[in-house]
Design a protein with these regions (language model features):
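Nucleotide-activated chemistry modules centered on ATP-dependent adenylation/adenylyltransferase
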Residues: 1-30, 35-257
C-alpha cells in the first residue's frame, strides 16, 4: 500500500541523499548512462553542494556495447567539475542468448585485436581485476573512515517490476543491509515514476543520454526507454531491431563483433 507522507518525491529523494552527505559518509553513484542513474547523480550533486561535499564520486563499468550517445554522455559527465569519475572496465564475460554455439563474449576481449572492439575505452578509464559487479564499490577504491558508512547509490525504482518492490519491502526501507564487503545500497528514487524522472530532467535542464531521443523518434514510449546490455536476455531483440534502423553502421559493427 502506498502512503502519502506529505512531501513530493523530488524533495524526499534529495533529503535521503543530503542526510548521508551531512553525516560525512562515503556515497558512490553508480552511473550506467541511463535516465535513472542520471537523476540520482544530479540529485547527489545538489545534496553534496548543499552539504559542502563536492565533488561527488561516480563509477561506471564499461560494457563496450551500449547504444550510441551513451558513452558520449558519460564523457560529458567525466568532464564536470562536480564529479570525481571512476570509469572502469573489467573484461567480464557477457551472455549472448542469440548464439547457442558461442554463448559468451568478453568486454574489451584482449584475446582479439583491439581493432575488432566496437569502441575503445576512454583514456581516463582504468582496468580492474574484479569481474563481480558487486565489487565495484569498496572501501579500498573509495577510502572511508572506519567510523563512517560507505553507500552505493543506485537508480532502482519499484515501478519497474514487482520483484523490485518486494526487494524494497524486504529490506525495510530505501537503504539495504551491508553486503559482504560492508557496502550498503541506497535507492533514493525508489518511489519515482517514469514521468517523475523525465519531469525532473526537463524542469532542471539536466544533461542526459540523447540515445533516448532517437528511441522516441523510432516510436518508443516513455515506459519502453532503457539503456542496458543488448545480448543478456531475449528482450534485447527489440533493442537490436531498433538499433538496426536507428544506427545501421553501428549495428553492423556490433553484429561482426
Amino acid at each position: 500500500m502506498k502512503l502519502n507522507i506529505g512531501i513530493n518525491v523530488f524533495d524526499a529523494a534529495l533529503n535521503r541523499l543530503q542526510e548521508l552527505y551531512e553525516q560525512d559518509h562515503t556515497i558512490v553513484i553508480s552511473q550506467s548512462g541511463g535516465k535513472d542513474s542520471t537523476v540520482c547523480m544530479e540529485l547527489a550533486i545538489m545534496a553534496a553542494d548543499a552539504a559542502g561535499k563536492l565533488p561527488i564520486n561516480v563509477i561506471h563499468r564499461d560494457e563496450e556495447i551500449l547504444f550510441p550517445n551513451t558513452y558520449e554522455y558519460l564523457d560529458r559527465v567525466a568532464n564536470r567539475p562536480e564529479v570525481n569519475m571512476h570509469h572502469v572496465w573489467a573484461g567480464q564475460p557477457v551472455i549472448n542468448v542469440f548464439n547457442r554455439s558461442d554463448p559468451y563474449w568478453w568486454i574489451f576481449d584482449e584475446q582479439i585485436p583491439r581493432e575488432e572492439w566496437v569502441r575503445q575505452p576512454p583514456d581516463y578509464a582504468y582496468k580492474i581485476d574484479e569481474m563481480n559487479i558487486n565489487a565495484l564499490v569498496t572501501r579500498d577504491r573509495f577510502p572511508t573512515p572506519e567510523d563512517k558508512e560507505i553507500y552505493a547509490c543506485i537508480g532502482l525504482r519499484v515501478q519497474e517490476s514487482p520483484n523490485r518492490r518486494m526487494g524494497l519491502f524486504s529490506s525495510k526501507g530505501h537503504i539495504t543491509k551491508p553486503n559482504d564487503r560492508g557496502v550498503k545500497y541506497v535507492r533514493p528514487i525508489y518511489d519515482w515514476t517514469d514521468g517523475d524522472v523525465w519531469k525532473a530532467i526537463e524542469n532542471f535542464k539536466w544533461d542526459y543520454n540523447h540515445a533516448y531521443d532517437v528511441m522516441v523518434k523510432h516510436g518508443r514510449s516513455k515506459n519502453q526507454l532503457r539503456i542496458a546490455p543488448l545480448t543478456m536476455t531475449q528482450a534485447g531483440i527489440k533493442d537490436l531491431q531498433l538499433a538496426q534502423k536507428a544506427w545501421p553502421q553501428w549495428f553492423d559493427t556490433v553484429t561482426h563483433r
